[in-house]
Curated annotation (Swiss-Prot):
Belongs to the LamB/PxpA family. It comes from Burkholderia thailandensis (strain ATCC 700388 / DSM 13276 / CCUG 48851 / CIP 106301 / E264). It catalyses: 5-oxo-L-proline + ATP + 2 H2O = L-glutamate + ADP + phosphate + H(+). HAMAP family: PxpA (MF_00691). GO terms for molecular function: 5-oxoprolinase (ATP-hydrolyzing) activity; ATP binding. The gene is pxpA. The lineage of its organism: Bacteria, Pseudomonadati, Pseudomonadota, Betaproteobacteria, Burkholderiales. Pfam families: LamB_YcsF (PF03746). The keyword Hydrolase applies. PANTHER family: 5-OXOPROLINASE SUBUNIT A (PTHR30292:SF0), UNCHARACTERIZED PROTEIN YBGL-RELATED (PTHR30292). Keywords: ATP-binding, Hydrolase, Nucleotide-binding. GO terms for biological process: carbohydrate metabolic process. This is 5-oxoprolinase subunit A. Forms a complex composed of PxpA, PxpB and PxpC. InterPro entries: Glyco_hydro/deAcase_b/a-brl, LamB/YcsF/PxpA-like.
Length: 254
């Protein structure tokens, strides 16, 4: 049994370098919701040094709301925005001796792409047209994952250690009760169940089947680093191999 651990980096949380010792894939903010060129370069350099797979973390252009505000934009604008952000991170990665291996949308763009076919197609088209060898990280069992596979891209299904789920497999919105799981024991138990049992219990009590291929560890909580360490240890103690999906890694060139 195997699993990937990923974290969203370059968002100003201050623990990026330490998290890169624990995760196997890094989703690096591309400046539109957080971060910027210096942070992108730092994260890429650290990822290359530590052998962590590099991913782009594009979003809506919304630094005021950390990219978490839903937007109604033309598909052409979403396409162009994703393409722009991929190009920026790719240039930095190339200069640092690495390359992008995957793409994971951020925040509202991630959630809207999971349920809106037009947005999913716009994001997938941008990724495919930029580099069809890139893998796509998306919410497990979502329409975004289906769209990526339909376009011939490798899709990696993502689950969340610290987020509540609804019965349809979607995440509980952050504005609603049950959105965040902050009890460490519960997070560890849920993560092991998602990876080994391929299911998660919804906030309404039902078991929801899912295909867990990568687990997101958010790096912006007060205990995020300690929890990331414990979850890595728990997975390895359970005999689960932790590594990035596929053969693409940070230090490889195309």
């Amino acid at each position: 049994m195997e699993i990937d651990l990923n974290a969203d980096l370059g968002e100003g949380c201050g623990s990026d370098e330490a998290l890169l010792d624990l995760v196997t894939s890094a989703n690096i903010a591309c400046g539109w919701h957080a971060g910027g060129a210096p942070a992108m370069r730092d994260c890429v350099r650290w990822a290359v040094e530590k052998g962590v797979s590099i991913g782009a973390h594009p979003s809506f252009h919304d630094p005021e709301n950390f990219g978490r505000k839903e937007m109604d934009l033309p598909a052409s604008e979403i396409y162009a925005g994703v393409l722009y952000q991929l190009g920026a991170l790719s240039a930095i990665a190339q200069a640092e001796g690495g390359r992008i291996a995957h793409v994971k949308p951020h925040g509202a763009l991630y959630n809207q792409a999971a349920r809106d076919a037009e947005i999913a197609d716009a994001v997938v088209s941008a990724i495919h047209d930029f580099d069809p060898s890139l893998a796509v990280f998306g919410l497990a069992s979502s329409g975004f994952v289906d769209a990526a596979r339909h376009a011939g891209l490798v899709a990696v299904e993502e689950v969340f250690a610290d987020r509540g789920y609804r019965a349809d497999g979607s995440l509980v919105p952050r504005s609603q009760p049950g959105a965040l799981v902050d009890d460490e024991r519960e997070m560890l138990a849920r993560t092991l169940e998602m990876v080994r049992g391929q299911r998660v219990r919804a906030v309404t009590g039902e078991w929801v089947p899912l295909n867990a291929q990568t687990v997101c560890l958010h790096g912006d909580g007060p205990h995020a680093l300690a929890f990331a360490k414990r979850i890595r240890e728990a997975l390895e103690a359970a005999g689960i191999d932790v590594h990035a999906p596929g053969a693409l890694h940070a230090g490889e060139r195309a």
